[in-house]
Amino acid sequence: MNRLPSSASALAYSAHALNLIEKRTLDHEEMKALNREVIEYFKEHVNPGFLEYRKSVTAGGDYGAVEWQAGGLNTLVDTQGQEFIDCLGGFGIFNVGHRNPVVVSAVQNQLAKQPLHSQELLDPLRAMLAKTLAALTPGKLKYSFFCNSGTESVEAALKLAKAYQSPRGKFTFIATSGAFHGKSLGALSATAKSTFRKPFMPLLPGFRHVPFGNIEAMRTALSECKKTGDDVAAVILEPIQGEGGVILPPPGYLTAVRKLCDEFGALMILDEVQTGMGRTGKMFACEHENVQPDILCLAKALGGGVMPIGATIATEEVFSVLFDNPFLHTTTFGGNPLACAAALATINVLLEQNLPAQAEQKGDMLLDGFRQLAREYPDLVQEARGKGMLMAIEFVDNEIGYNFASEMFRQRVLVAGTLNNAKTIRIEPPLTLTIEQCEQVIKAARKALAAMRVSVEEA
């Protein structure tokens, strides 16, 4: 049955939502009503599948906490007033914490002047952010294209590589098994999980996948493509595979890939959407090997957890293909003043507080604790691994991983799995996590594993 549009209903719903936005706290009845509403509207108007997913990581088979507000820099509070240490970090967006006051202040100050650009006049913050990124990023990276998300930054990188290499007769892209580069059509062609790919086949032609971390497989692919005339335009990869399960390549892998790209005349695209902005103990993960890509993709934490923003940064040689017609690839909201204000403030906080170094120190502490737990619970934990504040605990099977997420939820620590590896729980907290909170997380993990062992023994 067709439903007629109702302006009156839309007005009432929007007014109700605005009233909630104005509130700082909810009483008990308001909290219960909001929980019911959110569950109903997710089921009827967003996607009911999300409710089942949330059930897998919450206690007691409930539909889970309805997020209400940030607590401190490193915590979340639900509608019931329960505070959780955030070890998920919005899949890596909260590197400088929740509602970092420097970032919030920058956005508020810009909002008081001009929230969005006119599209005709030159907007100063876009220029200033591009200049800042040129100074911050490694090698000859110089020009920036701004967008709103990681998948958009990857799309821009792929189009830029095509525009540069097409006149040279190079059209093939090499990606890696286990990779995640986004879910729009181009980015999905580089992503390597069949669950996401199959419903949208056929994807873009010209993409090949080789095992991640296997430099001989990469060499063979580049060589075979050259022999068959399918010359490679670019190699795209993550320095550390995030959604693949926090998979670290062998030492020297990125350096070797860079040399192969130079040998075969292929561009090197590094997707640092998740590993960038200090996450791994360096501002960018490629800096661990002093590797300089031709194109670098950023997003997630670039906006400081306050505004969405992505960036595709390239060398002048590559980016110059857009000079004659800068409208070949654009986006209405990319590089808007609010997002640029957030990004500039985020970079300032990361550098002023030396958060990449803190990520290395606190990441080592957490990883040592998780590895000790892996030794204590070999029947449950297969491995703990990571770099900086990007870590993973891999369990012996998928179900144990789900149970661990639920047990950690009971301990008031928020974690979740990775999209391409169901056995793996990701640990990706804000870089501002305190030493005391690191200790709390390790204690919570120990309690969770102890409870899980009891459940297994009783089963």
Curated annotation (Swiss-Prot):
SUPFAM superfamilies in UniProt: PLP-dependent transferases (SSF53383)
Record-given protein name: Putrescine aminotransferase
EC code: 2.6.1.82, 2.6.1.29
InterPro entries: Aminotrans_3, Aminotrans_3_PPA_site, Class-III_PLP-dep_AT, Putrescine_aminotransferase, PyrdxlP-dep_Trfase, PyrdxlP-dep_Trfase_major, PyrdxlP-dep_Trfase_small
Pathway the protein contributes to: Amine and polyamine degradation; putrescine degradation; 4-aminobutanal from putrescine (transaminase route): step 1/1
Gene that produces this protein: patA
Superkingdom of origin organism: Bacteria
Gene Ontology BP annotations: L-lysine catabolic process; putrescine catabolic process
Native organism taxonomy: Bacteria, Pseudomonadati, Pseudomonadota, Gammaproteobacteria, Enterobacterales
GO MF entries: diamine transaminase activity; identical protein binding; putrescine--2-oxoglutarate transaminase activity; pyridoxal phosphate binding
Function description: Catalyzes the aminotransferase reaction from putrescine to 2-oxoglutarate, leading to glutamate and 4-aminobutanal, which spontaneously cyclizes to form 1-pyrroline. This is the first step in one of two pathways for putrescine degradation, where putrescine is converted into 4-aminobutanoate (gamma-aminobutyrate or GABA) via 4-aminobutanal. Also functions as a cadaverine transaminase in a a L-lysine degradation pathway to succinate that proceeds via cadaverine, glutarate and L-2-hydroxyglutarate.
Enzyme class: transferase
Cofactor: pyridoxal 5'-phosphate
Organism: Escherichia coli O6:K15:H31 (strain 536 / UPEC)
Chain positions recorded as pyridoxal 5'-phosphate binding sites: 150-151, 274, 332
Residues bearing PTM N6-(pyridoxal phosphate)lysine: 300
Keywords: Aminotransferase, Pyridoxal phosphate, Transferase
UniProt similarity note: Belongs to the class-III pyridoxal-phosphate-dependent aminotransferase family. Putrescine aminotransferase subfamily.
Reactions the enzyme catalyzes: an alkane-alpha,omega-diamine + 2-oxoglutarate = an omega-aminoaldehyde + L-glutamate; putrescine + 2-oxoglutarate = 1-pyrroline + L-glutamate + H2O; cadaverine + 2-oxoglutarate = 5-aminopentanal + L-glutamate
NCBIfam families per UniProt: PRK11522.1, putres_am_tran
